[in-house]
Amino acid sequence: MSINSNLGGLSHRNMILSDKRILEEIDKGHIIIEPFKRECLGTNSYDVHLGKHLATYRSRVLDAKVHNEIDGFEIPKEGFVLQPNTLYLGVTMEYTETHAHVPFLEGKSSTGRLGIDIHATAGKGDVGFCNTWTLEISCAQPVRIYAGMPIGQLIYFVVEGEIETMYNTKANAKYNNPTTRPVESMMWKNKF
């Protein structure tokens, strides 16, 4: 099935990659997903799963100008019950690299129907992002979650124009250190 390259004035360059195109970009090394499972590839997205590590902030009152420390823990085999009014930091099982496209992480509809939000505002990645994804998890009511459950989906947009500085080469990039654990806010590193 082909899509008209000019839909409603939008250039084909502003479109989301299809399943076939995602596979082509993986073959070229422009997109890396580890581990990659073919059955997780959707029509125009790739399903990602909740890793085994969660964290919560030590303080109930967070301060944007200071380093807010977190306490990490593993999700037990019997699952973990999320509570409303608590921000949990989670992490994807999948490590990803994106060298030519803008990745967006969105929750799966089945996750949303359980009342779970997987990101507060940080759904967009940058070209050159090479890491697992930290999730900002909250819930509408108590809900039990499990390591390995499908939690979100990555979609990829084509970038128009040449990239001057990839995220993984930016001197001031705050989330470049590879990790399999959630990473707390680094807002305190900004000058304001």
Residue ranges and their predicted role:
Residues 2-192:
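DUTPase catalytic domain/fold
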